[in-house]
Amino acid sequence: MALVDPDIFNKDPREHYDLLQRLGGGTYGEVFKARDKVSKDLVALKMVKMEPDDDVATLQKEILMLKTCRHANIVAYHGSYLWLQKLWICMEFCGAGSLQDIYQVTGSLSELQISYVCREVLQGLAYLHSEKKIHRDIKGANILINDCGEVKLADFGISAQIGATLARRLSFIGTPYWMAPEVAAVALKGGYNELCDIWSLGITAIELAELQPPLFDVHPLRVLFLMTKSGYQPPRLKEKSRWSSSFHNFVKVTLTKNSKKRPSATKMLSHQLVSQPGLNRGLILDLLDKMKNPGKGLPVDIEDEEPEPPPAIPRRIRSTYRASSLGIPDADCCRRQMEFQRPRCVDCRPQAETVRLYPPAHFGSTSPRSQLSDSDDDYDDVDIPAPSENIPPPLPPKPKFRSPSDDGSGGIRDDGQLSPGVLVRCASGPPPRTPRPGPPPATCSPHLTARSDPSLWNPAAPEPGQPPLVPPRKEKMRGKMENEKRREKYPLLVKLFNGCPLQIHSTAAWTHPSTKDQNLLLGAEEGIFILNRNDQEATLEMIFPGRTTWLYCINNLLMSLSGKTPYLYSHSILGLLERKDGRTGSPIAHISPHRLLARKNMVSSKIQDTKGCRACCVAESASSGGPFLCGALETSVVLLQWYQPMNKFLLVRQVLFPLPTPLPVFTLLTTPGSELPAVCIGVSPGQAAKSVLFHTVRFGALSCWLDDSSTEHKGPVQVIQVKEDMVMVLMDGSLKLVTPEGAPAPGLRTPEIPMTEAVEAVAMVEDRLEAFWKHGVQVWAPGLKQPLQELRDPTLTFRLLCSPRPVVVETRPTDDPTAPSNLYIQE
């Protein structure tokens, strides 16, 4: 590859510089703090990742242009290196960082500080424009401050050209929040000139005053669309009384929509805001001192809600189950252990419980683990027989691999019926690495009871005097065998936690990106808690205080509906964990999170204009890119979409609409070919062609409300879209499978399933329907009129907390609804 300038070296820059520290990274690469090995001067090395087909020659020409830029307000260029498909650009080092880094710690700048920054930037722009150069990327992140308080423009020239060369690899380069309207409409109106930098400076002035540019919570593509509309109005400062008339006028003049009427940088230097006396580096030095001591004068958000009351429970909660002392328990206690807990055995040491409720084994079957050696005694799975009601249970022996034929836990009883068995893990260490055998095949009985009632394990015997049942026909046997296969796939409930005192509203699953530990996040009345499923001892740890009613996890980011006055929040999960680990031994303070940390280190932030949010829902659409998030506000409905380059949800639409109270349903529905989803806020019975009528608010065109709000339902109402062309509707004691338009779902023999119990919630797990009612759960196959399996226990109340990833169930004693709960998960 031919080089066009001897200053661009084909060698490793680390031969000349010692890399000291990584300062940050972005779309194009990383920036490092380095020291010259000869002069010992500090420099900044920007490493840009290249591709073999990138236009390196054009990049080199742009780099050569940087050599000619010599100005006090422009970061000096020292040279470049091209090594191993990476372009290294050596620039002047500015130790205080960018203005964006600074205001994230200090809060908004004062008007005098903003005036000084704008004057220095205008001086740099006036020089660039006189040299026929355009910066193209003026914003807070590209305005650097050195330790002396001097203001420097960075990323000149090279960023624009890099963006052009990398456009083949990235669908959307940069963000349009600082972009001038003529740049956004370049495809429609032609080119632009250096005055686009003046517009960007006006947006930057608003950014320094309000900590973000206008429309920053709106999706970038929507911002581009808005700026190209003829009725687009330039933004203004929000708080009129806080800023002087001179500042308001400066923003107005720089944000002149017609670029031909927009003043030049030289003319703007005579504006009253930047020509006033008293603008000197001391203003920035005061700002740097405030950054080094963020506790001084940290601004308080006047819209903050009242402080949360101190939590009534500890921030670390351990599972209450412990291995009991050696003894012979009574029959009821032993039966309870067989249901959900480990047996009382000598070698059991405290550890997170794993309990499986298995259907009974086939006649004459033996345990697949009976052939294993005794060397794995620490990880035994023990088959325990159901106790007789009249005979006290014997003292449990030391756990040992035994087959049902050895200990009587399976096989034929004296009365000819199969005896049930419950497999209970009793482990003193981590589970074995060898794969565990699957659950034993189910019998033909559809019932599985948590109380191990033998009458529910097997088909009922015919009453005396009745003829025997006629054998099924061959054509029916095939369907029966398919049902048996479905039963074998039924995922069993595994206990996660015993004795949970929280009032849980929502859950979400999250996998740690480094350790790969599987975690369960709980949104409760007391706050947000995390449970590491890989820990030896089950422990709930608070990571965010305050009432939380809804959770959603995406890309190590947690969205929540939290607070005494509910707001939609965005949390960095890794940041929450780091803050928790740094506070070991001291409780989390019951004040707003942003008052605890400097702004740069904030891990939790409110989504603007979501005060009083009543409900949230999420829908994923393959045709539209990232998932959609919808929020029900007091007088409107907002729709946000995930934007991967910024790793956040951004506003797409907001519809003013008076939502009903109460709000029984709030679910997003997507249809094939539609750009935006609709939000369902109610359902009602339909006619034959449309068995369900969805009451929806649509975002694409005019809002649509199917006016049948007076419908009263018998029992709970639930709407879940399980596939792109199938919606599951629980209404009036039956479960209907319909299309997003409300018509019966095609390909099903029975699109409506009448529930045999008072079902409170439903979930679709793979190809199974799971219906949860007060004392158990039924498992159905779509299109069948009879449940495949059933788990029931009248002594417990069941509540579905989350589905479908994963299904989390909470149980409490029926006779004590306020008792601590047990938490289960489906594998």
From Swiss-Prot:
Residues at the catalytic site: 137 (proton acceptor)
EC number(s) stated in the UniProt entry for this protein: 2.7.11.1
Which residue intervals make up region (Disordered)? Answer: 296-315, 359-485
Query: What cofactor does this protein call for?
Result: Mg(2+)
Q: Fill in the PTM field for this protein.
A: Autophosphorylates: phosphorylation promotes ubiquitination by the Cul7-RING(FBXW8) ubiquitin-protein ligase complex, leading to its degradation by the proteasome. Tyrosine-phosphorylated after activation of hemopoietic cells.
The residues the record assigns to binding ATP are 23-31, 46
Start-end of Acidic residues biased regions: 374-383
Picking any one GO biological process from the record gives: cellular response to phorbol 13-acetate 12-myristate
Q: Which residues does this entry mark as bearing Phosphoserine?
A: 171, 373, 375, 403, 405, 419, 592
**Where in the sequence does UniProt note compositional bias of the Pro residues kind?**
429-443, 461-471
- Biased composition (Basic and acidic residues) is annotated at 472-485
**Residue span, CNH domain:** 501-806
PROSITE patterns attached to this UniProt entry? CNH (PS50219), PROTEIN_KINASE_ATP (PS00107), PROTEIN_KINASE_DOM (PS50011)
Main function? Serine/threonine-protein kinase, which plays a role in the response to environmental stress. Appears to act upstream of the JUN N-terminal pathway. Activator of the Hippo signaling pathway which plays a pivotal role in organ size control and tumor suppression by restricting proliferation and promoting apoptosis. MAP4Ks act in parallel to and are partially redundant with STK3/MST2 and STK4/MST2 in the phosphorylation and activation of LATS1/2, and establish MAP4Ks as components of the expanded Hippo pathway. May play a role in hematopoietic lineage decisions and growth regulation.
Q: How does it assemble?
A: Interacts with MAP3K1. Interacts with FBXW8. Interacts with CLNK (via its SH2 domain).
Family, similarity comment:
Belongs to the protein kinase superfamily. STE Ser/Thr protein kinase family. STE20 subfamily.
Q: State what protein this is by name.
A: Mitogen-activated protein kinase kinase kinase kinase 1
- Specify the species: Mus musculus (Mouse)
Query: In the record, what lineage is assigned to the organism producing the protein?
Result: Eukaryota, Metazoa, Chordata, Craniata, Vertebrata
